[in-house]
Structure formats: structure tokens, C-alpha cells
């Protein structure tokens, strides 16, 4: 019987989250944590996860709309992943992309990345309501990505073909706790702030745009001191947007006192945890030792991983 295996990576946001929803650029990278989707031909369709069943229906509907039909033999879907869920690492984008490619492949449809993006975007919207598309573009393309959503119908990205300078050490992720809110909730929170304080919010978005541009240059040129300062400033703006809770802020201040910098990585969270923090320090071992002492969850990552792919 036919079996299809597809995988997609998680992602990090160097800078630009939330502002990217409003037409500002985001700088992202795929990481070496992946989700695997396996579709197997079977005599009877079987999907145990209700959320996955709903997502499958959304993507199937998009495929039917595009290709005017959806005829297949019965199949089962299984998922395995080492991307933490609900921590800002793009698990929903990775799942939407991998499931889309797996279904298209199972149906014998071979299409380009633009079509895969458009179909998978309906799945990402199922999770987040009005996603920018940046996470999805990154997990499909892989590597480092510069992304900007001009309009719903115009999403522009550039695959950055450089690697971080040799002076730049290892980024790590430290878990500040799982957010109580969904990414959709946090996007709505920023939307309400923009309505209540449009000038303040726009100024923060403008600042994030300049810092995001600086981040690209700093990673390319290898200026560690300026990189740390850039991360700090970007994080302060995110705090002013109201997407970083006290728990995460306290941990970030400790990391700064140790000589490093940290920021949320995605939608964030306010009431409890804010998900995985993207952390940088010239002496990463110092941070690892601190995290070990405090029993904090740490993920070591490699930046610039391969994007969406068929594994079997």
C-alpha cells in the first residue's frame, strides 16, 4: 500500500513578529526541529486527533477548490514532531505545510511552492485567523528569510543566501513557560492596542522595522555587541506592545544581567508563560549553566535548516 512521508522544519523570528501583520518586514530562519506527516493508504480512513481531522478538512477543501475534485482511496494520517507546540516555533505552520504536500503527493498532484503556500495558508488561517504568512514561507523555503506582507494577495519574501558571520556564536532557546493564550489571541491583543493607541503602536512598528533591518546586517557582519543591543531594543518594543508577560520579562532581565539578550519568539503570551525565548550570549556556556541550575528547559538549535521536503 502507498505511504507518503513529508517533513517541515520549525522556525525562529529574529525580529519582526506582530509588526509583520501590519506590513512591516520580518527576519526569520528555519531550525533543525521538524514535524513529520505520514499518509498511508488504508481500507478505512482513521484519524484519532479531532484538531487534525478539522485541519485536514480545511486543506482538503482548499485542494478541491483549486483542482475541482478530491478523489482518493481511504488513508490514515500520523504525526510525529520534535517541535514544541504552542511555543512560538511555528508548529502550526510546519504541520499545515507538511500536511498539504503529503496530501498533494498522495493524490498524485505535483505543484510549485506558491501553490503549496496558498493551500497551506488556509490551514494556518484555521489556527491563527489572520496570519502574516511569514512562518509558513519560512518552513516551506528553509534557510534564512526576509518576509513582508504587503496585502493579503501580495506576500513578498527573499531567501537570504548568507550564513551568520563566523564571529556569531550559538543561539539557544529557553522556555519561559507555555502561553495561556493562543497566537490568535495575542494578535488580537495587538490589534486592540492599535485601535486604542494608533500613533504609539505605529511608532513601535516603525522602530521594529529599523531594528529588523539592523539585525540582518549585524548577523552578516558579525558585530556581537551591537547584536545583543539590537535584541534588547526589539524585546522592549514587544513588551510595550503587551505581548510579553511578567514571568518571561523576569527571566529576560536575568539573562541581560548575565551579559546576554533574549526576546520572545513569535506570538508571545501575557497571563502566564510567553513560550520559547530566543537567547544570545557571547559565552553560551554561562547561560547553559544558569539554565541547568534553575532547571530551565533549553533547546540547542541550528539555524538555516532545510525547508519542506518529501522524505519517502
Briefly describe each language-model feature range:
Residues 2-15, 20-21, 28, 36-71, ...:
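C-terminal nucleotide
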Residues 114-116:
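Short, charged, amphipathic alpha-helices and their helix-cap/turn boundaries
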Residues 73-85:
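Glycine/charged-rich beta-loop-alpha catalytic/anionic-binding loops adjacent to active sites
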Residues 87-110, 143:
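DPxDG-like acidic metal-binding loop motif
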Residues 11, 93-97, 134:
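Short alpha-helical patches at coil-to-helix transitions and adjacent helical residues
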Amino acid at each position: 500500500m502507498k505511504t507518503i512521508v513529508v517533513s517541515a522544519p520549525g522556525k525562529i523570528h529574529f525580529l519582526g513578529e506582530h509588526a509583520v501583520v501590519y506590513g512591516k518586514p520580518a527576519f526569520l530562519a528555519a531550525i533543525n526541529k521538524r514535524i513529520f506527516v505520514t499518509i498511508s493508504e488504508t481500507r478505512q480512513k482513521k484519524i484519532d486527533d479531532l484538531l487534525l481531522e478539522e485541519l485536514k478538512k480545511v486543506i482538503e477543501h482548499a485542494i478541491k477548490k483549486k483542482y475541482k475534485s478530491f478523489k482518493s482511496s481511504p488513508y490514515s494520517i500520523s504525526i510525529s514532531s520534535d517541535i514544541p507546540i504552542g511555543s512560538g516555533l511555528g508548529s502550526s505552520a510546519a504541520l499545515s505545510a507538511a500536511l498539504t504536500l503529503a496530501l498533494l503527493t498522495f493524490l498524485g498532484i505535483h505543484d510549485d511552492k506558491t501553490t503549496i503556500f496558498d493551500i497551506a495558508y488556509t490551514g494556518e488561517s484555521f489556527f491563527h485567523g489572520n496570519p502574516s504568512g511569514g512562518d509558513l514561507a519560512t518552513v516551506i523555503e528553509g534557510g534564512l528569510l526576509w518576509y513582508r506582507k504587503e496585502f493579503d494577495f501580495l506576500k513578498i519574501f527573499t531567501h537570504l543566501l548568507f550564513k551568520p558571520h563566523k564571529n556569531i556564536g550559538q543561539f539557544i532557546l529557553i522556555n519561559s513557560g507555555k502561553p495561556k493564550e493562543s497566537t490568535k489571541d495575542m494578535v488580537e491583543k495587538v490589534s486592540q492596542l492599535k485601535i486604542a493607541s494608533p500613533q504609539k503602536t505605529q511608532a513601535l512598528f516603525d522602530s521594529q522595522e529599523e531594528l529588523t533591518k539592523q539585525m540582518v546586517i549585524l548577523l552578516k557582519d558579525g558585530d556581537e555587541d551591537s547584536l545583543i543591543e539590537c535584541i534588547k531594543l526589539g524585546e522592549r518594543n514587544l513588551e510595550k506592545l503587551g505581548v510579553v508577560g511578567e514571568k518571561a520579562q523576569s527571566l529576560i532581565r536575568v539573562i541581560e544581567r548575565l551579559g546576554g539578550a533574549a526576546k520572545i519568539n513569535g506570538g508571545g503570551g501575557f497571563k502566564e508563560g510567553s513560550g520559547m525565548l530566543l537567547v544570545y550570549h557571547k559565552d553560551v556556556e554561562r547561560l547553559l549553566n544558569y539554565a541547568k541550575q534553575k532547571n530551565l528547559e533549553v533547546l540547542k538549535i541550528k539555524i538555516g535548516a532545510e525547508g519542506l521536503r518529501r522524505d519517502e
